[in-house]
Structure formats: structure tokens, C-alpha cells
Curated annotation (Swiss-Prot):
This is Large ribosomal subunit protein bL17. One of its GO terms (molecular function) is structural constituent of ribosome. Belongs to the bacterial ribosomal protein bL17 family. It comes from the Bacteria. It comes from Mycobacterium leprae (strain TN).
């Protein structure tokens, strides 16, 4: 059974908060970024990210689940056709909240919430760097036993050469 959210609602009632989040999410998916108050942006972030996760899966069931929350079919089509496939290789973190200066009239804290459009180049570069370091360590580990065998062979040769010297001395 669904439980009501704790704490104050945005805009008053639960139904108004649901309508507010629906409209904010539709605007976010339509425009890519929106400017709103900071509490609304913080409330919108998990709501929008769950919808994007549904869009990434792309099944008919997921489309119907999103249509329950976003009644605008054009926005849902854009979400499933463009936004979902764009984030297919990203595991969460589809949105970014940037704080901006307070609103002039009532000094309300404002923020810009936007879809992250950059590919995760840094994580791919870090992953490639880690793989290269691991392969270099493996190559060094294979070279060390070969070098130790050579060292042992030279010490054996020294031992053999020193033994005949001892035999000559006796």
C-alpha cells in the first residue's frame, strides 16, 4: 500500500505535488533544462531519473508505466526514442542540479536542473588506465621469474667455476 511522503508537500496537497512533479518532468524532458526553485529541483531529480530508467528498458510495460505519470504522449515518445537510448550506457546520474542566484522578488533559492548530455569520458579513461596498469603488472610478473632464473643460472655458473678452483688448490 502506498504511503504518503513525509514532510511538507510542494504546493500544499499530495495531488498538487504529483501534478507539479509531472509538469516539471515533462518540461525537463521537452527542453533539456529548466530553472526552478531548489526544493522543487531536489524533489524532481529522483522522479525524473526513475522515468529515464524506465525509458532505458524500453518495453511496452515500461512505456505504459511512464504514461501513467506523464500523460503527454509527445514527451513520452521523445523520452523513449531519444533520451532513454542516449543514457543506455550510464547507470544513474542522468540529471544535474546547479544552484543559481536567488530570485529577485522573494529571495527564493533557485536552481537549474538539466539532463547530463556529456558522455562519461573520464570513467572510460579511468577504466582503460586501470586495465592497462593491470596488464603491465601481469607482464612484469611474468618477466620477473624469467629474470630470477637467469640470475640463478649465473650464480650456479659462478659456483661451478669456483669449485674447480677449490679442487686445484687442494
Amino acid at each position: 500500500m502506498p504511503k504518503p511522503t513525509k514532510g511538507p508537500r510542494l504546493g500544499g496537497s499530495s495531488s498538487h505535488q504529483k501534478a507539479l512533479l509531472t509538469n516539471l518532468a515533462a518540461s525537463l524532458f521537452e527542453h533539456g533544462r529548466i530553472k526552478t526553485t531548489e526544493p522543487k529541483a531536489r524533489a524532481l531529480r529522483p522522479y525524473a531519473e526513475k522515468l529515464i530508467t524506465h525509458a532505458k528498458k524500453g518495453t511496452l510495460h515500461n512505456r505504459r508505466e511512464v504514461l501513467k505519470k506523464l500523460p503527454d504522449k509527445d514527451v513520452v515518445h521523445a523520452l523513449f526514442a531519444e533520451i532513454g537510448p542516449f543514457f543506455s550506457d550510464r547507470d544513474g546520474g542522468y540529471t544535474r542540479i546547479i544552484k543559481v542566484e536567488a530570485r529577485k522578488g522573494d529571495n527564493a533559492p533557485m536552481a537549474v536542473i538539466e539532463l547530463v548530455r556529456e558522455k562519461t569520458v573520464t570513467s572510460e579513461a579511468d577504466r582503460a588506465r586501470r586495465v592497462a596498469a593491470a596488464s603491465a603488472k601481469a607482464a612484469q610478473a611474468q618477466e620477473k621469474p624469467a629474470q630470477e632464473e637467469e640470475v640463478e643460472a649465473t650464480s650456479d655458473e659462478v659456483a661451478y667455476t669456483s669449485e674447480p678452483d677449490k679442487a686445484a688448490e687442494h
